């Protein structure tokens, strides 16, 4: 029994040493009864695979956005991500979109070295409120320098 207690103490102690995290802040908060709708797509013609031929992406990708007449748009954001430090300017339905913010993360892979990834977002609430239920096409995401 003494060994079990020592073992549990040791494991608990180790768990406190190997936990890494960052602070999380609320981005936006809405009060009331809201539902959530998301649409999305990919520019990847195949599954991501570091060992395979993944070095080409599609030039554009589309998704249909449909709202019923009784639904209102409170907020809308465009998110995009990929490999590298980031392409902060993309095109949505022919309109240039510049990121409000870009976030980067680096993953140190024992076989491939440091792999860098990015994610960007843009508040497009007015754009979506104006255009409503249509087909949205994202294009001009350029990550060719890292493929």
Kindly give the residue locations of the regions a language model identified.
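Disulfide-rich extracellular domains of secreted proteins
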Residues: 21-147
């Amino acid at each position: 029994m003494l060994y079990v207690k020592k073992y549990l103490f040791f494991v608990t102690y180790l768990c406190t040493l190997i936990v890494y995290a960052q602070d999380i802040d609320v981005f936006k908060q809405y009060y009331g009864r809201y539902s959530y709708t998301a649409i999305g797509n990919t520019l990847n013609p195949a599954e991501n695979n570091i060992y395979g031929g993944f070095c080409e992406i599609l030039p554009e990708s589309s998704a249909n956005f449909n709202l019923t007449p009784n639904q209102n748009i409170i907020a809308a954001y465009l998110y995009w991500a990929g490999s590298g430090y980031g392409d902060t300017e993309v095109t949505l339905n022919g309109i240039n979109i510049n990121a409000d913010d870009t976030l980067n993360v680096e993953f140190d892979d024992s076989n491939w070295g440091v792999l860098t990834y990015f994610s960007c977002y843009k508040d497009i609430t007015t754009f979506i409120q104006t255009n409503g239920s249509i087909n949205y096409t994202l294009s001009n995401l350029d990550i060719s320098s890292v493929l």
